[in-house]
Amino acid sequence: MKQIGLRVDVDTYRGTVEGVPKLLKILAKHQIQASFFFSVGPDNMGRHLWRLLRPKFLWKMLRSNAASLYGLDILLAGTAWPGKKIAKDLGYLMKQTLNAGHEVGLHAWDHQRWQAKVGRWSEAQLTEQVKLGVDALVQAIGQRVTCSAVAGWRADERVLAVKQQFGFDYNSDCRGTHPFRPILPDGTLGTVQIPVTLPTYDEVIGIQVKDEDFNQFILDKMKNSQGVPVYTIHTEVEGMSKSTEFATLLEMVHQENIQFCALSHLLPENIQRLPVGRIVRSEFPGREGWLGCQQEA
């Protein structure tokens, strides 16, 4: 049976309150354990609207029919009013996710600010953002945070160095092909990385595939994937407007003898045997701006 890591990104307040319970129900029905990464601070995702001035982002929003896909409340969150604190109000859902047998990790304190400003933040600012997120998630789940996946895959060597002090068991901060040990700025090796290898819905819809053909498209990608495959879904998409389609995909995956699992299950017993690599800034198909991408050492 082929194993594929299933990563669930929770970016927004509504994605938490509506998408998480629905996905927990769907995953329980199929007896699947996944890795959930929560945004825990203010939901300011609506402040991404200024990026509509950038052609690549505008095209992404148009081809994915973002208003219908996400809903206006998500697209406008934190614009005309302060963003609601997610973990403060909804921390019980993070604890519920953990109690359901899933891995729970940190995505971001402020998802929008991380994507917009991480490349310019000082070391102190980076540290503050991660610490705010870790502290809020610890408060919500009542135990240490074992894993993390930065917002929008916006990570480079500076980010990795800052995250070392938080003692995560693994990170999933980049796009790539297989788990590896990243080289830090001082030449030492950092916490193991488990890259996302497969495309997300919003990266390919309207470019490589029509909406009605997406399930077969991504299933074919899974069947043909090499390395150590990892697939990312979002509570705002697969847990809401596309939840029916996602449930159908799980049935298709099962018929192909593919099993989804939490990301930590993809690691070998001895991580010292993993290859060494780097995370570098790079453009990525279907995304606007730079992402952290795996590079062989």
From Swiss-Prot:
It catalyses: 4-deoxy-4-formamido-alpha-L-arabinopyranosyl di-trans,octa-cis-undecaprenyl phosphate + H2O = 4-amino-4-deoxy-alpha-L-arabinopyranosyl di-trans,octa-cis-undecaprenyl phosphate + formate. One of its GO terms (molecular function) is hydrolase activity, acting on carbon-nitrogen (but not peptide) bonds, in linear amides. Pathway: Glycolipid biosynthesis; 4-amino-4-deoxy-alpha-L-arabinose undecaprenyl phosphate biosynthesis; 4-amino-4-deoxy-alpha-L-arabinose undecaprenyl phosphate from UDP-4-deoxy-4-formamido-beta-L-arabinose and undecaprenyl phosphate: step 2/2; Bacterial outer membrane biogenesis; lipopolysaccharide biosynthesis. Residues 2-261 form the NodB homology domain. Its EC number is 3.5.1.n3. It is an enzyme of class 3 (hydrolase). GO terms for biological process: 4-amino-4-deoxy-alpha-L-arabinopyranosyl undecaprenyl phosphate biosynthetic process; lipid A biosynthetic process; lipopolysaccharide biosynthetic process; response to antibiotic. InterPro entries: ArnD, Glyco_hydro/deAcase_b/a-brl, NODB_dom, Polysacc_deacetylase_ArnD. It comes from the Bacteria. GO terms for cellular component: membrane. The keyword Cytoplasm does not apply. Keywords: Antibiotic resistance, Hydrolase, Lipid A biosynthesis, Lipid biosynthesis, Lipid metabolism, Lipopolysaccharide biosynthesis. CDD domains: CE4_ArnD. PANTHER family: 4-DEOXY-4-FORMAMIDO-L-ARABINOSE-PHOSPHOUNDECAPRENOL DEFORMYLASE ARND-RELATED, GLYCOSYL TRANSFERASE-RELATED. Belongs to the polysaccharide deacetylase family. ArnD deformylase subfamily. Catalyzes the deformylation of 4-deoxy-4-formamido-L-arabinose-phosphoundecaprenol to 4-amino-4-deoxy-L-arabinose-phosphoundecaprenol. The modified arabinose is attached to lipid A and is required for resistance to polymyxin and cationic antimicrobial peptides. This is Probable 4-deoxy-4-formamido-L-arabinose-phosphoundecaprenol deformylase ArnD. It comes from Photorhabdus laumondii subsp. laumondii (strain DSM 15139 / CIP 105565 / TT01) (Photorhabdus luminescens subsp. laumondii).
